[in-house]
């Protein structure tokens, strides 16, 4: 009598090795499923016949389904027509677009893996390209819904593990985050500007020593000054003609998604309606174009969240920082405390000054009277000009040299209409402003609420039953 048997398949074995090998076969697994269904087991020959029959049916189905193109979503009557379609120009173009779409998805997933610290060594580029081609290749299937998605998933996994970084380029671990690089660039610009300002001040101080010169020398100086003005104008024009930095978001593109608008105002309206993005103190905004351009560089080049700024984690792609701002509801500017100095060059708060006259153009230079009356303050050591400007003493120059942020040209006249249109959109959405009568009404309502709360607390404490000195029993037994 055989010692080693299989009760499910009803067979016997000579040794334990053959028995263990039998337990790993498909025949044994098939009989186990039949046993669960209370069906009789099949023999090895019967199982092989069933396998061959199933393979024949699968081949028949594959032949019939080979006339469907998954890329173009078209069905063909014959296999020859299907092969001719694969060589057509339209199919090649659609296949190329599919390859680009897969590449974009792979790069986005690799960026997420990189942020999570899942980057690994790269693999062969040929293997990666083969995986992408396999993912988008027109595989025959019965219908688009029944097309097996396994190859695409495998291809994405292969490419994601293979690249482990930004698409086809591997990120150097020693490379600085884009946010830090952008901050360093801004610091260099600020230092360069401070050096230029200090040089101009030194030239002004040197010019205080007056000397008698001839008329010819005066003409030469005038010519030199004219040439300097021309050179400065040319330099300004060159700076204006310089394009935006690489990766910066244009002023017609949304800062929080991939939406593109035909104009700046439509872009601002889109960000307000779809992302609830409001520009703070917009009634004092003087350069809306410059502000949106600066924010585009901050998000596109520096990969910086507008609310987190230097805090929070670093991002290595524009899509990642946009997704963060949308998910965390950070589609707003952080202007608390000293952070507001970052955007000071785009605002003009002169209209909020107490000595500002209504209807006065802040850009228009005041006409000086014929009689020059100058005032001097001994305490502050300042000379007050008729225009209201204050001139400090030379001994306090170290304090006047301080610079807070980059200085930019203010263009109120060019942006007044644009700011007005944005204000109309804000008011249409229920915005009441952060200053003026609306702010006073809000403060009054807060005061009324506080007084009401105090009165209710006082009344409740006065009528509280626990403060009764003598308690009368309500129930008598």
UniProtKB/Swiss-Prot annotation:
GO terms for cellular component: cytosol; Golgi apparatus; nucleolus; nucleoplasm; preribosome, large subunit precursor. Pfam families: zf-C2H2_2 (PF12756), zf-C2H2_jaz (PF12171). The modification Phosphoserine is found at residue 276. Residues 196-212 have a biased composition (Acidic residues). Signal peptide: none annotated. InterPro entries: Matrin/U1-like-C_Znf_C2H2 (IPR003604), ZN622/Rei1/Reh1_Znf-C2H2 (IPR041661), Znf622/Rei1/Reh1 (IPR040025), Znf_C2H2_jaz (IPR022755), Znf_C2H2_sf (IPR036236), Znf_C2H2_type (IPR013087). It is found in: Cytoplasm; Nucleus. Residues 135-212 are annotated as: Disordered. Expressed in lung, kidney, spleen, liver and brain with lowest expression in kidney. The modification N-acetylalanine is found at residue 2. GO terms for biological process: intrinsic apoptotic signaling pathway in response to oxidative stress; positive regulation of apoptotic process; positive regulation of JNK cascade; positive regulation of kinase activity; positive regulation of MAPK cascade; ribosomal large subunit biogenesis. Residues 167-178 have a biased composition (Basic and acidic residues). GO terms for molecular function: preribosome binding; RNA binding; zinc ion binding. A zinc finger (U1-type) spans 4-28, 67-91. The keyword Zinc applies. Phosphorylated by MELK. The phosphorylation may redirect the protein to the nucleus. Ubiquitinated by HECTD1, leading to its degradation. Keywords: Acetylation, Cytoplasm, Metal-binding, Nucleus, Phosphoprotein, Repeat, Ribosome biogenesis, Ubl conjugation, Zinc, Zinc-finger. Pre-60S-associated cytoplasmic factor involved in the cytoplasmic maturation of the 60S subunit. Belongs to the REI1 family. Homo- and heterodimer. Associates with pre-60S ribosomal particles. Interacts with MELK and MYBL2. Interacts with DNAJC21. This is Cytoplasmic 60S subunit biogenesis factor ZNF622. It comes from Homo sapiens. The lineage of its organism: Eukaryota, Metazoa, Chordata, Craniata, Vertebrata. The gene is ZNF622.
């Amino acid at each position: 009598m055989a010692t080693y048997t299989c009760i499910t398949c009803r067979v016997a074995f000579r040794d334990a090795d053959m028995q263990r090998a039998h337990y790993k076969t498909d025949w044994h697994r098939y009989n186990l499923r039949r046993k669960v269904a209370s069906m009789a087991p099949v023999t090895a020959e019967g199982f092989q016949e069933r396998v061959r029959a199933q393979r024949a049916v699968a081949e028949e189905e594959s032949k019939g389904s080979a006339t469907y193109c998954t890329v173009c979503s078209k069905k063909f009557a014959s296999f020859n027509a299907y092969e001719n379609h694969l060589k057509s120009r339209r199919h090649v173009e659609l296949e190329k677009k599919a390859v680009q779409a897969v590449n974009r998805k792979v790069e986005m997933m690799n960026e997420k893996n990189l942020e999570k610290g899942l980057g690994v060594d790269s693999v062969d580029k040929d293997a990666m390209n083969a995986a992408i081609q396999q993912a988008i290749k027109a595989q025959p299937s019965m219908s688009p819904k029944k097309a097996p998605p396994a190859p695409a998933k495998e291809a994405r996994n292969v490419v994601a593990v293979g690249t482990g970084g930004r698409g086809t380029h591997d990120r150097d671990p020693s490379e600085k985050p884009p946010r830090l690089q952008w901050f360093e660039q801004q610091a260099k610009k600020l230092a360069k500007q401070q050096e230029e300002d200090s040089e101009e001040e030194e030239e002004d101080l040197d010019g205080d020593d007056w000397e008698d010169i001839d008329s010819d020398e005066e003409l030469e100086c005038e010519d030199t000054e004219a040439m300097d003005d021309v050179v400065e104008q040319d330099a300004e024009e060159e700076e204006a003609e310089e394009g935006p930095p690489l990766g910066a978001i244009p002023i017609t593109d949304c800062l929080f998604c991939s939406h593109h608008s035909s104009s700046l105002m439509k872009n601002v309206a889109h960000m307000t309606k779809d992302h609830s993005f409001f520009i703070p103190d917009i009634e004092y905004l003087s350069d809306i174009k410059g502000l949106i351009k600066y924010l585009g560089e901050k998000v596109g080049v520096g990969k910086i969240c507008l609310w987190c700024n230097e805090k929070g984690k670093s991002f290595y792609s524009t899509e990642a920082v946009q997704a963060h701002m949308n998910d965390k509801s950070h589609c707003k500017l952080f202007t608390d405390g000293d952070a507001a100095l970052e955007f000071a060059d785009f605002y003009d708060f002169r209209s909020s000054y107490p000595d500002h006259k209504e209807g006065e153009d802040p850009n228009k230079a005041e006409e000086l009277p014929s009689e020059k009356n100058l005032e001097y303050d001994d305490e502050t050591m300042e000379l007050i000009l008729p225009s209201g400007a204050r001139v400090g003493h030379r001994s306090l120059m170290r304090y006047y040299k301080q610079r807070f942020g980059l200085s930019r040209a203010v263009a109120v006249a060019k942006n007044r209409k644009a700011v007005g249109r944005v204000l109309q959109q804000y008011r249409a959405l229920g915005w009441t402003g952060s200053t003026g009568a609306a702010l006073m009404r809000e403060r009054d309502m807060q005061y009324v609420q506080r007084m009401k709360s105090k009165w209710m607390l006082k009344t409740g404490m006065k009528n509280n039953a626990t403060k009764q000195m003598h308690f009368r029993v309500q129930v008598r037994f």
